């Protein structure tokens, strides 16, 4: 086999379809987020505003987080020195897991090197722990959930997105005695819509199923202490396993699950993705713990309120211009263009001509024909920056003769 030719064909296919991913080299400046500097391909530098980051609340720059990380770094050094089982468990990891468990009202938590690995490792391990487990998965679940569900082959049922009637139809058709788990998300990141948590929990109770919720795009962002949509809606006690991230609203790095002590102990003991991975650096654990603790407070609520206000303002301004946005009331602002080449072109022009950095979102992240720009306004974006973004979008939409009819929600 000509391996180089095969690689060339694979990469060329992405170019031909307009979905080859280009990394934008940026340098964030401490204390200045969302401002950054773009290292242009021609060697020049350009000041930009980041509009597509997952540091939703700017906590990656917060003095409380940085102070905790500096203190830990000076106290114990850089790496953890091992897996959790072999010299890699520290007081920082223990405190972080206790903070997470308290956040979700659970007995225990387990920290992974990413939320992707937490999903993959946990869902695949549940098949080992519960032989014959049937997993019911929302059709728009994240890739990490899909991979975990596919691993350790077992029965799975895919229900139409947020369609609880279809879920009930599928679960009612299966063996009542079989172990069951419903896996879904609280906020779906590409459309910004919410999962029907209460209705899914009702079905789980009726059929004796476990509930597994991915709150990656919700933790830190919703609820009086930032525990997510389940907390906001008073439903945390009805969820068996929470998955979350430390790398989005909390602004640091890593992922986790929170559940009963018995469930966490079993996953800890059986999940290869946990057992054979080096643990988080102590400074990372310290920063994440400080971020979670801060966002539980009234000061954290002020950040959430400011973020929601900026998201509403941006949506209102874009709607007034007839932009094809999808608005489900979340913090995510998708603007649908519907063509990968056009989406990339608009993204490139926003960056080079206006200093607005928003990454194009193409297939397979979203279905073909729904390619989009996905804006994530934060509390540290100001109204002047929103004005600049809206002005740039208006000019480019006219220049490129793009559709101004509102997208279907």
From Swiss-Prot:
The modification N6-(pyridoxal phosphate)lysine is found at residue 248. It comes from the Bacteria. The active site is at 248. Its EC number is 2.3.1.37. It comes from Rhodobacter capsulatus (strain ATCC BAA-309 / NBRC 16581 / SB1003). One of its GO terms (molecular function) is 5-aminolevulinate synthase activity. Homodimer. This is 5-aminolevulinate synthase. It catalyses: succinyl-CoA + glycine + H(+) = 5-aminolevulinate + CO2 + CoA. Succinyl-CoA binds at residues 21, 137, 156, 365. The keyword Acyltransferase applies. Pathway: Porphyrin-containing compound metabolism; protoporphyrin-IX biosynthesis; 5-aminolevulinate from glycine: step 1/1. GO terms for biological process: protoporphyrinogen IX biosynthetic process. InterPro entries: 4pyrrol_synth_NH2levulA_synth (IPR010961), Aminotrans_II_pyridoxalP_BS (IPR001917), Aminotransferase_I/II_large (IPR004839), AON_synthase_class-II (IPR050087), PyrdxlP-dep_Trfase (IPR015424), PyrdxlP-dep_Trfase_major (IPR015421), PyrdxlP-dep_Trfase_small (IPR015422). The gene is hemA. PROSITE patterns: AA_TRANSFER_CLASS_2 (PS00599).
